[in-house]
């Protein structure tokens, strides 16, 4: 017989049944041989309410029998100066020195 201490306490589910959605795996065909590829389609206002507005980037984690979709937080806008710095860092060492010399002249340090 089970003791009182080994009976599981009832708990609320993390997701309410009203938030559950049911999908059916359909297919998309691929040209030129029209091979059937498994496909899922999700649409509805509930996506935006759940944090998946149009244009939101999504991380997808796949496990056996489980797919987890996570909305990525929007990245803050990078300043024009940081964008320029990123471009300069891709240049050759010689061109980077030329850019540094130009900056020094403009700043009046040399």
UniProtKB/Swiss-Prot annotation:
Subcellular location: Cytoplasm
EC annotation from Swiss-Prot or TrEMBL: 3.1.-.-
Keyword terms: Cytoplasm, DNA-binding, Endonuclease, Hydrolase, Nuclease, RNA-binding
Residue ranges of every copy of the SpoVT-AbrB domain listed in the record: 29-74
PROSITE patterns: SPOVT_ABRB (PS51740)
UniProt cross-references to InterPro entries, sorted A to Z: SpoVT-AbrB_dom (IPR007159), Toxin_SymE-like (IPR014944), TypeI_TA_SymE (IPR020883)
GO biological process, one term: RNA metabolic process
Family that this chain belongs to: Belongs to the SymE family.
Name of protein: Endoribonuclease SymE
Organism of derivation: Salmonella typhimurium (strain LT2 / SGSC1412 / ATCC 700720)
Gene: symE
């Amino acid at each position: 017989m089970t003791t009182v201490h080994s009976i599981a306490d009832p708990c609320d589910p993390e997701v309410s049944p009203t938030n559950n959605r049911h999908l059916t795996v359909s297919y998309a065909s691929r040209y030129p041989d029209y091979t059937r590829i498994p496909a899922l389609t999700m649409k509805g206002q509930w996506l935006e309410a759940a944090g998946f507005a149009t244009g939101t980037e999504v991380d997808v984690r796949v496990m056996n029998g489980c797919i987890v979709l996570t909305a990525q937080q929007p990245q803050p806008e990078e300043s024009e100066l940081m964008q320029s710095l990123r471009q300069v860092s891709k240049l050759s060492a010689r061109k980077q020195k030329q850019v540094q010399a130009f900056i020094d002249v403009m700043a009046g340090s040399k």
